[in-house]
Amino acid sequence: MPIIEPGDKSLKDLAGLHLWHGELSSCSQRVRITLEEKNLDWNSHIISIPKNEHATPEYQAIHPYGLVPAFVDNGVLLIESCDIITYLDENYSKFSLQPNDTKDQITMSNWLISADKAQADLKLLSHEFLFRPRKKMSSEELEAFSKNHNNQTLVTFIKEWQIGNIFSKEKLDGSVNRTDAYFSKLDNILKNQKWIAGEKMSLADIAWMPNIHRMSLMDWPLDRYLNLTRWFDQVKLHSSYQVALVNWENDGQAEGFRAYVKRRKIETGIHVTEFGSLTKPASL
């Protein structure tokens, strides 16, 4: 896994575990869940995405792409969430989060890769179906963000989201189709086993917990996947789900998302189920 040379050299002098993260960031949620499952003490550094704190020179000296999370372990910097949770499990062996069986280990690794690939679609769907009520940037603020942020891929995405009232149908259909395909594959795997990579909870489950939670907030029809729904029900029984994910949401935030989703559907007809493969009955 890639260890990053920090632009901020003072990070090399940091003792202990440090996490720069966003409350609602799904990638941050993965890392917090892993830290909680492994009962590790860590230092929290909140980066407010709505306030564009990820676009500051100070933060981009920590994370060169201006994304969250960033993680430091006694001076060692990592920036990809699946790399971070794998690092934590390999370097802090108490409460192992990897399967014992070699075949299951390969399954886990493949689903970590899939979770990473699914991130772009999760981002697009979240911004469309949950984050639209966020205050729009003024033209001056958007210009400043574009100038200050080093990550041009993110800048292009934010500009498109800020300027338009809805992403293109082509993009939304594609993101829905790919997400539905992943969920269907997970549902099929979970038909014959308790967890994604066997009979033990692993990093694969942690990597996908935030995604399913996020989709539940936007009223994604999870009842299309009976086994995945059963899995999510047992996930929610883990204290790490509550402590490291739900408790970081502001009071009433989940209810606010759900109310917005319902209101938008009534007023405009726009809802995630109006796109891609979700417009068709679930495959049996």
Indicate where each model-derived feature is located.
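GST-like fold's C-terminal all-alpha helical module
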Residues: A120-L237, L284
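GST-like domain detector, emphasizing the conserved glutathione-binding G-site
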Residues: M1-Q152, R264, H271-L284
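Positions that flank functional sites
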Residues: I49-P50, M201, N250-D251
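A short, structure-level motif marking secondary-structure boundaries and short turns
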Residues: A15-H18, E23, F167-K171, S216-L217, ...
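Short, hydrophobic secondary-structure boundary micro-motifs
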Residues: F95-N100, D121-L122, I196-E199, Q242-V246
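Active-site-flanking alpha-helical
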Residues: D89, N211-I212, L245
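Long, positively charged, glycine-interspersed low-complexity recognition regions
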Residues: T229-L284
